[in-house]
């Protein structure tokens, strides 16, 4: 059996509205393109290449849609603050548009709200990769933008060294904003070193697509830390989920398609080098259901009464026959099987899997994974 320690070691444009003001002067609104001024308020559509300059601070008001053919560039050290009002403030990258948001470990990009209670709308990326939703396409939950297609290598840009704080705007009782929502995002998109911090919904959610993500942190997301559906078949490598409240939902919630468990292409991502820490309560840690498949390797899941749950015949059968696999994985209590097809006995029959009630703390995780000590990450 692998010990927990061994497991963890591996582990604005022409139509953009810009508002700026000087002391003792009324605010003025002008249309801009190119590099936006320090202190500007960003709102509306971006239809040509637009840059937020290094170290500048900006306000975000309402939905900002980056339109096809345009690129929104965000330089290191930029801080974007969502205005506290009743309007959903969010950034949405439409099909054919790109975002180039590259912070650094010492100078990350920070997107936040005026107060922790003011939940804002996060980032939404709509690509041209597959979704197994009916008709092969869909509309984003916030912003109503089209996503889906057949280009699994589609490139929506680059996101690196970004911290998103206090997302989770409630559009209605059914729809709240994630830190980042990936809608049909292709593998040509680069995503690494991203933190969702104290969001009011999921940290990161994948709706189909083939995007691969690395070095991702979901800290105290009040719903699911990581969530996928609609046929996502990319990968997530070096990830941390940490929950402070026992009321938080799943550390990973995974579906193929909630309306059609047999929809194709089937969700089958690779999750490798993952530390998933709950904080008590009766919730589930990893919840595999609705026909999803998965490759889980080198994972620790603890801090939940049910750290690993498998549901639905399609999901459990895939695990039983090897279409889905769980290896090098330690959970803090027995696996829970709803259909009794893939059982706790099957889990421990794999010699690299283990059940260890000890679990792991956030401090231990930091001690075993040097990247979690980088200054761009907040873990308190």
Predicted feature locations:
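Short active-site-proximal "capping" loops at secondary-structure junctions
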Residues: 79-80
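Glycine-rich loop(s) and the adjacent beta-strand/alpha-helix scaffold that form part
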Residues: 107-108
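Extracellular beta-rich repeat passengers
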Residues: 26-72, 83-96, 103, 112-201, ...
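Bacterial Sec-dependent N-terminal signal peptides
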Residues: 1, 10-40
